C-alpha cells in the first residue's frame, strides 16, 4: 500500500518523464520540418524550431501535445492582451483551418513559419521584446513636488 501511495505522489519524476516524452515527440516533428523541401530556404530553421518547441511546451498545460482554449487564454493573458472566449475560438479556427478545437504542434509550427499573419505569431515577438527590455528601476521612486504633478 505504501509503495502504491508513493508512486501516486511521485509528481516531480513523473512530470519530468512526461515532459521528456513530449519533447521527443516534438523533436520528431521538428525533424520532419527540417527534411521538408518546402522549408529548406527558411533562415535559422533549427534555432526557430527549438524556440517554437520551448514556447509550445510552456503553454501546453494539459501535456497532451495540444494547446487548448484555456492554454491559449493563459498565453494571451501572459502577453498582456487578454481575449474573449469567442476571439480565442476564432484564433484556433484560423490556425487549424476549422478542423480542430486545439492547436497541434504541427499547426503551431506551420502558423509560425507561414506567411500569413496571426495573433499567435506575436507571442514569440512580444515575449522576446519583453525579455530584452530595459530592467525595471529598483528602490523607492524619486521624490516629486507639487509642481511636477499633472
From Swiss-Prot:
Keyword Electron transport carried by entry: no
Name the PROSITE patterns on file. EF_HAND_2
Q: Which GO terms describe its biological process?
A: actin filament bundle assembly; ruffle assembly
Residues recorded as bearing Phosphoserine in the entry? 2, 134
Q: Which residues carry this modification: N-acetylserine?
A: 2
What are its GO cellular component terms?
Answer: actin filament; cytoplasm; ruffle membrane
| Record-annotated membrane-spanning stretches | none
Provide the primary localization. cytoplasm
Membrane topology, record value:
Peripheral membrane protein
Which portions of this protein are annotated as coiled-coil regions? none
What UniProt keywords are attached to this protein's entry? Acetylation, Actin-binding, Calcium, Cell membrane, Cell projection, Cytoplasm, Cytoskeleton, Membrane, Metal-binding, Phosphoprotein, Repeat
> Where does this polypeptide localize?
Cytoplasm, Cytoskeleton; Cell projection, Ruffle membrane
Q: Which domain of life is it from?
A: Eukaryota
Q: Where is the EF-hand domain?
A: 47-82, 83-117
Oligomeric state and interaction partners are given as: Homodimer (Potential). Monomer.
What does this gene product do?
Actin-binding protein that promotes actin bundling. May neither bind calcium nor depend on calcium for function.
What's the protein name?
A: Allograft inflammatory factor 1-like
Q: Organism source for this protein?
A: Pongo abelii (Sumatran orangutan)
Q: Which gene encodes it?
A: AIF1L
